[in-house]
């Protein structure tokens, strides 16, 4: 056989690599030679060693090679995982045992080469992108990149050596085959894409029902061409621009020269990043109550008052509102006092025109919770844990106190909650005992969560029958509550109910609240006397707020006016003092009103119907201008009857009748009584700081929060339902139960899930009284510090039991609160304003 014949035979048969290459065969022209037929009579036998089976490359990897001989596999970053998995199973890869393809290549020549590996044995190579020339990989035996640089430098000659195929038809077919195929739209393909997107991105299924997602799809459909998706960096840059635009747009709704109030608080993310949130509150020209997140500033170092003041001042300067701050609402942390002092000094040093001292407002919701904690602490029933416990041992079961007091009752409920929630099997058994939906599990109170003790008891009382049945059926008699202990639960619910009601209401409201502070204090004093010392301490501080701001806010509420201070609980001098404070506080507003009236007013704005043009010509414009004084407005306003009406709506409707008072109300009513708006903001921040987003930088978190809260804090209802996908069933139910409890407690004639404690039941036994023992020194100290602002009343007479009360369950026994000196006579929980009487004399009641 001639040499040419051998060559043709070798070209017409596939190479001996164990693969089929149809492309190489089809491009070789046939000259009509007969196929080679081996001699079947040749019987010489050979013994070959069976090679190890070679794992074929996955279909996701692209085959490449010079002159269309695709005997190499191409590596790219997109297919790195599949490539490395296959390559490590090859002869070369199994020996090297490391990924040599994914690395930092500093040399410039790497930009012109592909990294490949031979299909036969996995030997690493590099392939020049221009001519597909194959060179040894620099990482193989540490050859370096000299050969790559040499080949690249002679790139002109290399490109000339590339053969030009004459088979144009074949090239077109290859191009069509290698081009990415677009999937035709079908309902099934669309559904598959959605499912893949949601599951691989770990998003909730309700995403498809989210209005913003639907709006995004609709906008893409309206595009004349397929929209181009921007990169992540472009979106982040655009986010910052949108935040600035929206904040500027919202602050433009603040009237010229108007004041706004702010609230602030600090928060630590799950990733231990600290932030300070600064929220602003104001009434716009249409009397809409506006909330705006002014800053969500990352913090570093020690959170001293001076440092926080510097951060706050930077936020105010950024928005150019340093001279427009009326009040600052904070919690009762010690560093906030330093913050306010430092802020006041800084603002005074600037010497701003018409600067009014900034007033510090303590958060009312924090005060209520401090008072409740003080009460529960005196009863020794406060939780000591910061988080819900998840561990349970038999030692916990045997560590219960022996006395049958109220402390023991709470410990039973707490331990039962830990016992059930600790084991999935015990949770399942507890849920199985419940026949109605929703099926619930016990919850445990924690020291750091507001109202957690009330919610724990409320849940336990709701599941009383299930508690009893579980303890009986699953052998936990020591954790089963008796009838008397369930009555103690009712007692604690009765005590903590008002605290829960007011705290929740303050946290949820988005209306003006400054006018309700005095009323909340009075109600809690009336309800409870065990915590009145803590309440009195803060109640007395309201006298030191500049200009009697609380009293003015109370008077500006149409349902209060001065009648609020006309009851027997207030001494007459307080009514006189607060009216005088109102008259003094309104002076600058009267001056500003007079200045605005001197300016030219379009006559058409003050015309009334039926006035002819002749009458307008002969009537002086100044005679048509309304004339009023602050004293006149105060007299007319206070002289009218009270109205049960939202203060904001009232002053919107009467802003032309009382223009000076309305301008004052528009400033005073912006003051938030609590910082609950910031607390709601932190709930949204937890959703942003998700554990899958742990790499977010503090600056990015700040921009995300500012963008989300430029118009409002709370998510819309459809957004809330979307976030429910991230929560467990029990977390969702706990939030719903809190809302349901609030609605039930606010209803006037609602039958509660627990029975209120009556006065007769409280006074049943002298030995079981819950009156805290007080020494003479303690009583005297409290009379001077915490009696508050209203004159002390006589002690109420003892309520005796009648014949029908004998079967009532006695008050919970607490051995820590009983002393020999305890009596059943209790002083009123009310702490009226004290009259100005000489403290050196003892006054006897006639």
UniProtKB/Swiss-Prot annotation:
**Region: Disordered, residue numbers:** 734-846
Keyword terms of this UniProt record: Metal-binding, Nucleus, Zinc, Zinc-finger
- Point to the regions of Acidic residues compositional bias: 756-769, 797-809
UniProt zinc finger (BED-type) residues = 104-166
Q: Where in the cell is it found?
A: Nucleus
Q: Which GO terms describe its molecular function?
A: protein dimerization activity; zinc ion binding
Q: Which SUPFAM superfamilies match?
A: Ribonuclease H-like
Task: Tell me the protein's name.
Answer: Putative transcriptional regulator tpeD
UniProt organism field: Talaromyces stipitatus (strain ATCC 10500 / CBS 375.48 / QM 6759 / NRRL 1006) (Penicillium stipitatum)
């Amino acid at each position: 056989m001639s040499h040419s014949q051998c060559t043709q035979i070798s070209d017409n048969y596939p190479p001996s690599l164990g693969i089929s290459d149809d492309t190489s065969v089809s491009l070789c022209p046939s000259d009509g030679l007969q196929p080679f037929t081996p001699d079947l009579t040749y019987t010489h036998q050979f013994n070959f060693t069976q090679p190890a089976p070679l794992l074929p490359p996955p279909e996701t990897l692209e085959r490449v090679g010079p002159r269309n001989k695709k005997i190499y596999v191409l590596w790219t970053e997109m297919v790195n995982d599949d490539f490395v998995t296959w390559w490590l199973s090859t002869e070369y890869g199994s020996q090297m045992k490391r990924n040599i393809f994914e690395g930092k290549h500093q040399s410039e020549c790497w930009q012109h080469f592909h990294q490949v590996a031979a299909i036969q044995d996995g030997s690493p190579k590099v392939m020049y992108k221009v001519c597909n020339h194959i060179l040894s990989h620099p990482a193989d035996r540490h050859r370096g990149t000299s050969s790559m640089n040499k080949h690249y430098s002679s790139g002109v000659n290399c490109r000339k050596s590339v053969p030009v195929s004459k088979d144009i038809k074949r090239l077109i077919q290859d191009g069509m085959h290698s081009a990415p195929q677009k999937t035709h739209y079908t309902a099934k393909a669309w559904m598959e894409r959605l499912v893949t997107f949601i599951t691989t991105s770990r998003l909730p299924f309700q995403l498809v029902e989210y209005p913003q997602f639907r709006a995004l799809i609709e906008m893409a459909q309206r595009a004349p061409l397929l929209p181009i998706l921007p990169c992540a960096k472009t979106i982040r840059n655009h986010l910052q621009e949108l935040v600035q635009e929206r904040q500027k747009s919202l602050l433009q709704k603040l009237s010229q020269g108007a004041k706004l109030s702010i609230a602030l608080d600090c928060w630590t993310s799950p990733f231990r990043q600290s932030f300070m949130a600064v929220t602003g509150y104001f009434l716009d020209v249409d009397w809409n109550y506006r909330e705006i997140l002014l800053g969500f500033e990352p913090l570093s170092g020690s959170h001293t008052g001076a440092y926080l003041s510097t951060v706050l001042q930077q936020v105010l300067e950024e928005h150019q509102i340093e001279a427009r701050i009326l009040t600052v609402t904070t919690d009762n942390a010690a560093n906030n006092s330093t913050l306010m002092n430092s802020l006041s000094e800084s603002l005074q040093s600037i010497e701003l025109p018409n600067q009014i001292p900034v007033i510090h407002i303590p958060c009312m919701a924090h005060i209520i919770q401090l008072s409740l904690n003080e009460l529960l602490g005196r009863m020794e029933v406060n939780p000591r844990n910061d988080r819900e416990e998840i561990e349970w041992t038999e030692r916990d079961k045997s560590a219960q106190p022996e006395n049958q007091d109220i402390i023991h009752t709470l410990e039973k409920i707490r331990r039962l909650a830990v016992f059930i929630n600790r084991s999935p099997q015990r949770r399942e058994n507890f849920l199985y005992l419940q026949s109605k939906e929703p099926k619930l599990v016990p919850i445990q109170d924690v020291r750091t969560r507001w109202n957690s003790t009330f919610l724990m008891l409320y849940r336990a009382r709701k599941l009383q029958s299930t508690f009893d049945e579980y303890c009986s059926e699953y052998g936990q008699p020591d954790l089963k509550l008796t009838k008397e202990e369930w009555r103690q639960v009712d007692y604690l619910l009765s005590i903590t109910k008002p605290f829960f009601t007011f705290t929740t209401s303050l946290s949820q409201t988005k209306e003006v609240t400054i006018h309700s502070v005095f009323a909340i204090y009075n109600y809690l004093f009336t309800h409870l006397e065990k915590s009145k010392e803590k309440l009195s301490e803060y109640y007395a501080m309201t006298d030191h707020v500049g200009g009697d701001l609380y009293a003015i806010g109370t008077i500006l509420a149409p349902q209060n006016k001065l009648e609020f201070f006309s009851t027997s609980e207030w001494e007459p001098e307080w009514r006189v003092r607060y009216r005088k404070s109102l008259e003094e506080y309104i002076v600058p507003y009267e001056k500003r009103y007079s200045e605005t009236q001197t300016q030219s007013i379009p006559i058409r704005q003050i015309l009334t119907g039926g006035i002819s043009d002749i009458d307008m010509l002969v009537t002086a414009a100044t005679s048509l201008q309304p004339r009023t004084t602050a004293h006149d407005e105060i007299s007319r306003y206070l002289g009218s009857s009270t109205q049960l009406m939202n203060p904001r709506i009232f002053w919107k409707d009467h802003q032309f009748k009382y223009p000076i008072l309305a301008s004052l109300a528009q400033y005073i009513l912006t003051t938030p009584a609590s910082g609950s708006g910031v607390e709601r903001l932190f709930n949204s921040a937890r959703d942003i700081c998700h554990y899958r987003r742990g790499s977010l930088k503090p600056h990015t978190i700040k921009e995300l929060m500012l963008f989300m809260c430029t118009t409002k804090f709370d998510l819309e209802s459809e957004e809330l339902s979307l976030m429910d996908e991230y929560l467990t069933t029990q977390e969702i139910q706990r939030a719903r139960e809190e809302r349901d409890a609030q609605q039930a407690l606010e209803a006037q004639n609602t039958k509660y899930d627990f029975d209120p404690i009556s006065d007769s039941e409280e006074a049943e036994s002298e030995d079981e009284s819950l009156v805290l023992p007080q020494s003479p020194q303690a009583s005297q100290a409290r009379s001077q510090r915490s009696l508050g602002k209203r004159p002390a009343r006589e002690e109420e007479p003892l309520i005796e039991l009648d014949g029908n009360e004998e079967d009532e369950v006695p008050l919970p026994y607490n051995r820590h609160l009983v002393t020999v000196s305890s009596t059943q006579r209790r002083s009123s929980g009310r702490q009226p304003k004290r009259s100005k009487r000489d403290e050196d004399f003892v006054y006897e009641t006639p």
